[in-house]
Amino acid sequence: MLDLLRSQGDNRVIKLTQAFKRDLRWFDKFLCDYNGVSMYYHKSVDHTVELDACLEGLGAVWNSHVYHLPIPLHYQNLGIVHLEMVNILVATKTFGPFWAHHKVLIKCDNQAVVQVLVNGRTRDPFLATCARNIWQVAAKFDVELVYQHIHGIHNPIADLLSRWTNHHSDFVKLYTYVDNPIWLNVNIDLLEMDCNI
């Protein structure tokens, strides 16, 4: 919205772009869920989630909760940047109700994805749709999301989960990082996005 308004200068008539209209739909949907109270601006992080995506799957760890989700056929043509963003959406939808009224640090090893979510800007329509869906879930549950880029070498648990094979060695590695992991069955429907916002 703001980019369009800034680019118009002093023109009196502005032709609304599709992106502008999607932003308006986002606000319209948000207002239906909004209860009028916001608890944002927490001083410290309450929860940390680490995520990773690869061409085989998505993985995340939050506290002792973990998941692995194989990439569905209709997403196998996506690049790694898109898969990383989809994984953040899946994590936000999965854990959002548990994070209500808290500040959450999302650690991701993809710098481009972190930049989109921190700056709120991208020219990629798919990334923009994912970002709006992430922000919609965060707004619905009054979650303040902050993002941090971490190098892949510092993200071993999520990396292991994204490449999960159910092999004995995977379980041994996981148990060295997480005591008594709680496996979540992530519903494939969480990959669906509202493309109208």
Predicted regions span which residues?
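Eukaryotic intrinsically disordered and solvent-exposed regulatory patches
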Residues: 33-37, 46, 91-93, 132-134
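RNase H catalytic domain
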Residues: 93-156
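Two-metal-ion RNase H-like nuclease active-site motif
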Residues: 41-55
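C-terminal reverse transcriptase regions that engage the nucleic-acid substrate
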Residues: 1-39
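Mobile genetic element proteins and their domesticated derivatives, centered on retroelements
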Residues: 1-2, 27, 50-52, 60, ...
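Flexible, low-complexity interdomain linkers flanking nucleic-acid-processing modules
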Residues: 143, 160-197
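A short, polar/acidic, helix/strand-boundary loop motif
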Residues: 63-86, 94, 111-128
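An acidic- and aromatic-residue-enriched active-site/binding cleft used to recognize and process polar
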Residues: 53-56, 63-66, 109-111, 150-153
